[in-house]
């Protein structure tokens, strides 16, 4: 059994932590040959020593252009078979496209890459013969379910959402949510940005867009349900009437292991669910009136063009402002909605055009944030 050469981008983040857990657990299956991080330089140095790397590429103290150049040099020098892209936010798109210039497998945890530029990703993969395997638990589940039953058999895709820490909060209570409140996710341990996205349901909105664009299915065939236990990660409903689900304990290492070894079957890793212990599963509809970013996600997925880019960029800026305590929790949706009022009907054809739209949307969001700040 051969050892797979692995590069982990974003090794100091939550996806990086999950990848490291697997590399330590299966040293006979994986060899870490390269990695990047954004900050936490001392931690990165310790990881380099642990995994016998000469260096870990760091991007937090340099310009965006230099950071991209460093990622490009890293990828061209490692001869990896699998690259995990755990870079957070729109910054991960450049890395995804660079990975796909090779023939290796892209284990894609950076959902923004698909939201911003799915057509560019698919084209790059076709040209090089590379493979993209999603690492998001929901999309990994859909990927596996479609592989098992065939895309032609699937009538509807159902994404599950935990509902976040404020699932039962009234609109009045949501107005008083603090940064500390928003970072307390009931199920997953994640970085600050994605924790806030989970609290607003923006994360699920991005996953709706990702599902539509990655699997090339109409938005009307995608549904979201709230499932607080986070045990059912996704379901597919077939034309024949059956519904199939993927269930496992909530742990990012499981879909990541699947992607690292694809197309080979992963070894036993998790303890199976015990259905004799009184396990119960609860589902409920999302409260889209109180969490409007989810509805925006469906609208954006339907509109396509540059609207997904604008949605993602404006939300990123709004979340940053919230974490800096410059706007309130409910203002995140307001800022994003305001940015979407601009004209985003152009269809970006290149990475540069995608990033130009991203920049324009961020400027719109910052203008709105400044106005909200003055009104406080």
From Swiss-Prot:
<feature type="binding site">
    <location>
        <position position="14"/>
    </location>
    <ligand>
        <name>NADPH</name>
    </ligand>
</feature>
<comment type="similarity">
    <text>Belongs to the DXR family.</text>
</comment>
<feature type="binding site">
    <location>
        <position position="138"/>
    </location>
    <ligand>
        <name>1-deoxy-D-xylulose 5-phosphate</name>
    </ligand>
</feature>
<dbReference type="Pfam" id="PF08436">
    <property type="entry name" value="DXP_redisom_C"/>
</dbReference>
<dbReference type="GO" id="GO:0051484">
    <property type="term" value="P:isopentenyl diphosphate biosynthetic process, methylerythritol 4-phosphate pathway involved in terpenoid biosynthetic process"/>
</dbReference>
<comment type="pathway">
    <text>Isoprenoid biosynthesis; isopentenyl diphosphate biosynthesis via DXP pathway; isopentenyl diphosphate from 1-deoxy-D-xylulose 5-phosphate: step 1/6.</text>
</comment>
<dbReference type="InterPro" id="IPR036291">
    <property type="entry name" value="NAD(P)-bd_dom_sf"/>
</dbReference>
<comment type="function">
    <text>Catalyzes the NADPH-dependent rearrangement and reduction of 1-deoxy-D-xylulose-5-phosphate (DXP) to 2-C-methyl-D-erythritol 4-phosphate (MEP).</text>
</comment>
<dbReference type="GO" id="GO:0030145">
    <property type="term" value="F:manganese ion binding"/>
</dbReference>
<feature type="binding site">
    <location>
        <position position="191"/>
    </location>
    <ligand>
        <name>NADPH</name>
    </ligand>
</feature>
<feature type="binding site">
    <location>
        <position position="111"/>
    </location>
    <ligand>
        <name>1-deoxy-D-xylulose 5-phosphate</name>
    </ligand>
</feature>
<feature type="binding site">
    <location>
        <position position="112"/>
    </location>
    <ligand>
        <name>NADPH</name>
    </ligand>
</feature>
<dbReference type="InterPro" id="IPR003821">
    <property type="entry name" value="DXP_reductoisomerase"/>
</dbReference>
<feature type="binding site">
    <location>
        <position position="13"/>
    </location>
    <ligand>
        <name>NADPH</name>
    </ligand>
</feature>
<feature type="binding site">
    <location>
        <position position="198"/>
    </location>
    <ligand>
        <name>1-deoxy-D-xylulose 5-phosphate</name>
    </ligand>
</feature>
<dbReference type="InterPro" id="IPR026877">
    <property type="entry name" value="DXPR_C"/>
</dbReference>
<keyword id="KW-0479">Metal-binding</keyword>
<dbReference type="Pfam" id="PF02670">
    <property type="entry name" value="DXP_reductoisom"/>
</dbReference>
<keyword id="KW-0521">NADP</keyword>
<feature type="binding site">
    <location>
        <position position="110"/>
    </location>
    <ligand>
        <name>NADPH</name>
    </ligand>
</feature>
<feature type="binding site">
    <location>
        <position position="185"/>
    </location>
    <ligand>
        <name>1-deoxy-D-xylulose 5-phosphate</name>
    </ligand>
</feature>
<keyword id="KW-0414">Isoprene biosynthesis</keyword>
<dbReference type="InterPro" id="IPR013644">
    <property type="entry name" value="DXP_reductoisomerase_C"/>
</dbReference>
<feature type="binding site">
    <location>
        <position position="136"/>
    </location>
    <ligand>
        <name>Mn(2+)</name>
    </ligand>
</feature>
<keyword id="KW-0464">Manganese</keyword>
<feature type="binding site">
    <location>
        <position position="204"/>
    </location>
    <ligand>
        <name>1-deoxy-D-xylulose 5-phosphate</name>
    </ligand>
</feature>
<dbReference type="InterPro" id="IPR013512">
    <property type="entry name" value="DXP_reductoisomerase_N"/>
</dbReference>
<feature type="binding site">
    <location>
        <position position="162"/>
    </location>
    <ligand>
        <name>1-deoxy-D-xylulose 5-phosphate</name>
    </ligand>
</feature>
<feature type="binding site">
    <location>
        <position position="137"/>
    </location>
    <ligand>
        <name>1-deoxy-D-xylulose 5-phosphate</name>
    </ligand>
</feature>
<dbReference type="GO" id="GO:0030604">
    <property type="term" value="F:1-deoxy-D-xylulose-5-phosphate reductoisomerase activity"/>
</dbReference>
<dbReference type="Pfam" id="PF13288">
    <property type="entry name" value="DXPR_C"/>
</dbReference>
<feature type="binding site">
    <location>
        <position position="15"/>
    </location>
    <ligand>
        <name>NADPH</name>
    </ligand>
</feature>
<dbReference type="GO" id="GO:0070402">
    <property type="term" value="F:NADPH binding"/>
</dbReference>
<feature type="binding site">
    <location>
        <position position="40"/>
    </location>
    <ligand>
        <name>NADPH</name>
    </ligand>
</feature>
<feature type="binding site">
    <location>
        <position position="207"/>
    </location>
    <ligand>
        <name>1-deoxy-D-xylulose 5-phosphate</name>
    </ligand>
</feature>
<feature type="binding site">
    <location>
        <position position="39"/>
    </location>
    <ligand>
        <name>NADPH</name>
    </ligand>
</feature>
<feature type="binding site">
    <location>
        <position position="12"/>
    </location>
    <ligand>
        <name>NADPH</name>
    </ligand>
</feature>
<protein>
    <recommendedName>
        <fullName>1-deoxy-D-xylulose 5-phosphate reductoisomerase</fullName>
        <ecNumber>1.1.1.267</ecNumber>
    </recommendedName>
</protein>
<dbReference type="InterPro" id="IPR036169">
    <property type="entry name" value="DXPR_C_sf"/>
</dbReference>
<keyword id="KW-0560">Oxidoreductase</keyword>
<feature type="binding site">
    <location>
        <position position="207"/>
    </location>
    <ligand>
        <name>Mn(2+)</name>
    </ligand>
</feature>
<feature type="binding site">
    <location>
        <position position="138"/>
    </location>
    <ligand>
        <name>Mn(2+)</name>
    </ligand>
</feature>
